Amino acid sequence: MWIKELELKHYRNYDHLLASFSSGLNVFIGNNAQGKTNFLEAIYFLSLTRSHRTRADKELIHFDHSTVSLTGKIQRISGTVDLEINLSDKGRVTKINALKQAKLSDYIGTMMVVLFAPEDLQLVKGAPSLRRKFIDIDLGQIKPVYLSELSHYNHVLKQRNSYLKSAQQIDAAFLAVLDEQLAGYGARVMEHRIDFINALEKEANTHHQAISNGLESLSLSYQSSVVFDKKTNIYQQFLHQLEKNHQKDFFRKNTSVGPHRDDLAFYINGMNANFASQGQHRSLILSLKMAEVSLMKALTGDNPILLLDDVMSELDNTRQTKLLETVIKENVQTFITTTSLDHLSQLPEGIRIFHVTKGTVQIDSDIH
């Protein structure tokens, strides 16, 4: 898939913008604080209905307006789709082909994106919540039902934690009802995650071995707070651990086990990647991003859109070449932001260049 056209009204520093793109490489050049990242954020937002930079929708609204509108024309294998998101103080409205979508899981996945931004370099050593977010964003696009299961799980988790904080003593019967619901939704969330990580590991290891010239292997490990022996037993064993932890959870006023506490570990040649070099970290993250692209295509039959936000300067020539070779080979529409073309080596033919200045975008040329 690829985005043919994007229109922004009152988004960040863009008062009004209408732009069309190449189905291949699109490079946005400009000084810092001109709107390059805002532009990629808008594409990300149109796909996932959320920003990767802020949780406050009001920050997305142009300073002298009260509403935001984003519309995009997406070319999928199945045909052209029109997406629209409108933000106001009354909330958020999402539409597909002018039809309002009642559920998030009905909208997300229509346009898939993979974002590679500087903050992704913290994925290995950062907080576990970063790695859970990484899993959730990818899985939500590949399997929209996952978002529904995760939403139900978080709703019951909130109920259970609220009860634990307010209760003067344990009502075992009431907790048992919440435990059964939490274990049911949680087990399905974990099953989806396990399948996804197993598939991602295969793709990422293939890319990592290519980048390292066969010198390094990459493996991933899903680390669950729920102790289980096999996937088919997760529900029963999760439920048992919830029941076993009633007193502990009551004392701590929160739920001590479940997918909300799970993590993802990375290993290079069997060694925890927390101890890897900076160069190995960059290769690992690059391998993951390329694996996201190839896995989405393998599981959905369509390519995602790749957003490279100011990361090419973080990669040496070898890693840049591997990345560009992959997107060209897989025919992936790619958006790159940079302050200068000097950071980019071996650019292919057929790219479209845009200049970004103070919330305006001008097409420079198509290079053939």
Curated annotation (Swiss-Prot):
PROSITE patterns: RECF_1, RECF_2. InterPro entries: DNA-binding_RecF, DNA-binding_RecF_CS, P-loop_NTPase, RecF/RecN/SMC_N, RecF_2. CDD domains: ABC_RecF. One of its GO terms (molecular function) is single-stranded DNA binding. The keyword Membrane does not apply. PANTHER family: DNA REPLICATION AND REPAIR PROTEIN RECF (PTHR32182:SF0). This is DNA replication and repair protein RecF. It comes from Streptococcus pyogenes serotype M6 (strain ATCC BAA-946 / MGAS10394). The gene is recF.
